[in-house]
Design a protein with these regions (language model features):
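Alpha4 helix (beta4-alpha4-beta5 surface) of REC/receiver domains from two-component response regulators
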Residues: 65, 85-106, 111-114
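Recognition helix of helix-turn-helix DNA-binding domains
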Residues: 161-197
Length: 218
């Protein structure tokens, strides 16, 4: 019986090596790469049985983009997202939900690599994967936020003023201030009138939520 072929896409070298070793020990054939460009070359050469994808890979396609493309071209491919992001919308606030056939694991919630392998086996065998969908956790601090609220939270974390946020989103200042206020209320953040406290509080929340804030590339 041939080994099942798994592609691992993870930009952190140590974690990529750890995952690769665990999968090989579990009997999988593994090819691991650190970027979307390298992954694309692998997928063009050979169809994998499964893919374990980090989501935030820097500029260019995300792991979500790759996973959706894989599932569109080969619905039988098992896809497991492995990420620090508690909510996939932080990469693209307007994106939809993760494909129901894919597992979504938060790196912060995994105690060992066996949980990752268990999730992979569950997807491969078309079993119930509800326990491997960390993005659907109702207790997630940002699960209640709308796409617009997620976007303003990211912009506030970058130190942008309310006026700058309004300009970037092409909204009025009053509408922007109201949205920011509703966002903070939803999160239970009491910021008072100190703008420095405001920024620090939001940045701390974003750090805890696993959100990666990047400067614009354009």
């Amino acid at each position: 019986m041939s080994k099942r072929f798994v592609v691992v896409v993870e930009d952190e070298p140590f974690l990529r090596s750890l995952i690769t070793n665990a999968l090989e020990t579990a009997g999988f054939e593994v090819a691991s790469v650190g970027s979307a460009a390298e992954a694309r070359k692998l997928f063009n050469k050979r169809d994998p049985d499964a893919a374990i994808l980090d989501i935030d890979l820097g500029p260019g396609p995300t792991g979500l983009d790759m996973g959706e493309r894989l599932l569109a071209l080969s619905p039988g491919t098992a896809v497991v997202y492995l990420t620090m992001l508690s909510d996939p919308r932080v990469i693209n606030p307007t994106s939809g939900l993760v494909n129901p056939r894919a597992a979504y694991l938060n790196k912060r919630k995994l105690s060992d690599t066996q949980e990752l392998i268990d999730a992979l086996e569950a997807v491969l065998h078309d079993q119930d994967i509800s326990e491997y969908r960390h993005d659907l956790d109702p207790n997630s601090p940002i699960a209640k936020l709308s796409a617009g609220q997620l976007q303003v939270l990211q912009l506030v974390s970058k130190g942008m003023t309310n006026q700058q946020i309004a300009d970037k989103r092409k909204r009025s200042l009053s509408a922007t201030e109201a949205l920011i206020s509703r966002t903070f209320t939803s999160l239970g953040i009491d910021l008072g009138r100190d703008s420095n406290t405001r920024i620090l509080a939001v940045k701390e929340f974003i750090r805890q939520a696993g959100i990666v804030v990047r400067d614009d590339q354009d």
